[in-house]
Amino acid sequence: MSYRDIVVHLTLDPRNAARIQLAIGLARRFGARVSGLYTVPPPNVPYYMGEYIPTELIQKQMDEAQKASVSAHTEFMSTCAGAGIEHRWLSSELAPVEALRLTVRASDIAIVGQPDPNPADPSSIPYGTDVLPHELALQAGRPVLAVPHNGPVAEIGRRILVAWNGKREATRALHDAMPLLRSAETVHLVTVGPERKGRTMLAEVTEHMQRHGLRLETAIVDPAGQKVGTALMAEAQKRQADLVVMGAFGHSRLREMVFGGVTETILSSMSLPVLLSN
């Protein structure tokens, strides 16, 4: 398996450039095509206007959306052409989760942005992106690579941390990330919890991964009262990982939020790219 078809999400977001560069890096490594999928936001009507919506307001927002689309198109096409990779432009008026879900099912991996966990103005979050990484991972049937909402994003895949708990979601993530794992300098296989249980969980999967020629280091992390997601991100930083691979747990983002899920913790505190799979 390899990544030969990559979809990158583009929207009203200054982080488009970071996602495009990450997609180009993967395309060069795997000989892939990159599809830039731009999702057109609907008019944003303030709630206090009720049913009365001035035509001028709608037209202004449509004009701004058109300008943003042209800007994103120019940036994507020129950057990919300059990099010499195969690429194409796609546009959709569907909500981001729906548009990406339909597109990525005929692709290998989707690259999306992490929503800002602490926006100064919640209305500034691009339409539909506040739930994007987690919901897409649960629905798409393909791996989803989430890019942090700030900070530099270097080339990924040299030092990878795999979060392992022996469950179906983690198994799916492990195999969906195999193209990256095979070319990594080091793979850190990490489980969080009691040592005895951790050793049992790591033993069989370690042997399996070594059969794929992976260079492995294993670790059992004591959360010491922290959330599991917080402990995993701390371990990733400690080991200078440039990518975290994990299962997208839960049946919905709401359920994850209610029960304080690992996925939600990771997505709200991530400082490096995270590959999610379900």
Where are these regions (language model features)?
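Amphipathic helical "hinge" segments at domain boundaries
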Residues: A68-C80
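Gly/Ser-rich helix-loop-strand patches that form or flank binding pockets
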Residues: G25-R28, A99-P152, A236-N278
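Small/aliphatic-rich secondary-structure junction motif
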Residues: M1-E56, Q139, G151-P152, I156-V221
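Aromatic/hydrophobic pocket-lining residues that form π-stacking "cages" and hydrophobic walls in ligand
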Residues: A23, F76, L100, V205, ...
